[in-house]
A protein has these predicted regions:
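Hydrophobic alpha-helical segments, chiefly the membrane-spanning helices
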Residues: 1-311
Length: 311
């Protein structure tokens, strides 16, 4: 048991560190290729923050633990919508950007509802996954099309990424090291989490919805809390809910096209909770485009109640 717990701790550490290194290297290469900063921010940096979820879910699906793969995504998204937004609002009331209310939250809601419908038969087929990925391409097109209007925000989000040019050889090294750590760490993490679930008599779905989801989402929580303290909470909530869209449409889309997934432990309650959590955030965001501290407390309480119901 202790060895498996060590696998989980070391695995998540490698995944998080590897994702950071891979993103740094990829951004440096993109800058040397004269790729526009806004495109870097909306693609490489955004995808880099979801790389832990991607690798853990992808490896889980390949190993035949579909509940762990989907549980990680569903749990991470609930974590993002309820705990990250809730705790950030408790730290400081959140002012929400109009584009988040009008585009990001509705798209996250549609993606979550679509996932719920697709899982009614207990499977995510290649066709289902293909539909999700096509939706991601549409979302990216809409995002890049509106990038000129959000240019200042995007520059701020990636501020500092290219201040010190990185040598090409070092960029390549970081990309390779990042990939190795992501793959190796994901394998350790999945092996440890699966073994712990077996030893405790807990389903892989519950482990995915709690330990795995929480572990892969910790960087977003830390970043959002710091952003809230510095008065940049609007960017934090946009990133959290934008990550929800990427997690469902891209991670489950790509993973499902490669290896269809059969769900056993992920229930309609879990998927419905995902939809409800985003609906609550959307409802709160309409009050003067702000989420107050009491609303943050409600979101946090709902998250705690949900996790308690799983245990």
């Amino acid at each position: 048991m202790l060895l498996n717990i060590l696998f989980i701790v070391v695995g998540i550490a490698l995944v998080l560190w590897g994702a950071d290194r891979l993103t740094d290297g990829a951004v440096a290469v993109a800058e040397k290729m004269k790729m526009p900063q806004i495109v870097i921010g909306l693609t490489i940096v955004a995808m880099g923050t979801s790389m832990p979820e991607f690798c853990v879910s992808f490896i889980s699906a390949l190993k035949g633990t579909s509940d762990l793969a989907v549980g990680n995504i569903v749990g991470s998204n609930i974590f993002n919508a309820l705990l990250i937004v809730g705790v950030s609002a408790l730290v400081a009331p959140m002012t929400i950007m109009e584009t988040t209310v009008r585009k990001d939250i509705p798209f996250a809601l549609v993606a979550s509802a679509l996932l719920l419908i697709m899982c009614l038969d207990g499977n995510i087929s290649r066709i289902d996954a293909g539909i999700l990925f096509v939706m991601f391409l549409i979302f990216m097109y809409m995002t890049l099309k509106g990038a000129k209007k959000q240019g200042a925000d995007a520059e701020e989000a990636i501020e500092g990424e290219g201040k010190k040019p990185m040598a090409t050889w070092l960029s390549v090294v970081w990309i390779l090291v990042g990939l190795i750590c992501l793959i190796g760490g994901s394998n350790l993490f999945v092996e440890g989490a699966t073994a712990v679930a077996t030893n405790l008599g807990v389903s892989e779905a519950v482990i995915g919805l709690t330990i795995v989801a929480g572990g892969t989402s910790l960087p977003e929580l830390a970043t959002s809390v710091v952003s809230a303290r510095k008065g940049n909470s609007g960017i934090a909530i946009g990133n959290a809910l934008g990550s929800n869209v990427f997690n469902i449409l891209t991670i489950l889309g790509i993973t499902g096209m490669i290896t269809p997934m059969t769900l056993k432990g992920i229930t309609y309650i879990d998927l419905s909770m995902l939809v409800i959590s985003i609906m609550i955030v959307w409802l709160f965001s309409f009050t003067k485009y702000k989420i107050e501290r009491w609303e943050g407390a409600v979101l946090t309480a709902v998250f705690i109640g949900y996790i308690y119901s799983l245990l």
